[in-house]
Curated annotation (Swiss-Prot):
HAMAP family reported in the protein's UniProt record: Ribosomal_bL36
Keyword terms of this UniProt record: Chloroplast, Plastid, Ribonucleoprotein, Ribosomal protein
Pfam families, per the entry: Ribosomal_L36
Family annotation (InterPro entries): Ribosomal_bL36, Ribosomal_bL36_sp
Listed PANTHER family: 50S RIBOSOMAL PROTEIN L36, CHLOROPLASTIC (PTHR42888), LARGE RIBOSOMAL SUBUNIT PROTEIN BL36C (PTHR42888:SF1)
Gene encoding the protein: rpl36
Organism lineage string: Eukaryota, Rhodophyta, Bangiophyceae, Cyanidiales, Cyanidiaceae
Record localization: Plastid, Chloroplast
Alphabetized GO MF terms: structural constituent of ribosome
Record bears the keyword Plastid: yes
Cytoplasm found in the keyword field: no
GO BP annotation list: translation
UniProt source species: Cyanidioschyzon merolae (strain NIES-3377 / 10D)
Protein name from the UniProt record: Large ribosomal subunit protein bL36c
Family that this chain belongs to: Belongs to the bacterial ribosomal protein bL36 family.
Amino acid sequence: MKVRSSVKKICANCQIKRRHGVLRVICSNPKHKQRQG
């Protein structure tokens, strides 16, 4: 899980979802997991 100020899609499978007011990137590749912190 990377914590970044700007979250971006890295590949075609990446999806940006808002969970409890936190932007997250959900992907089949675990290396692409990010959240905004």
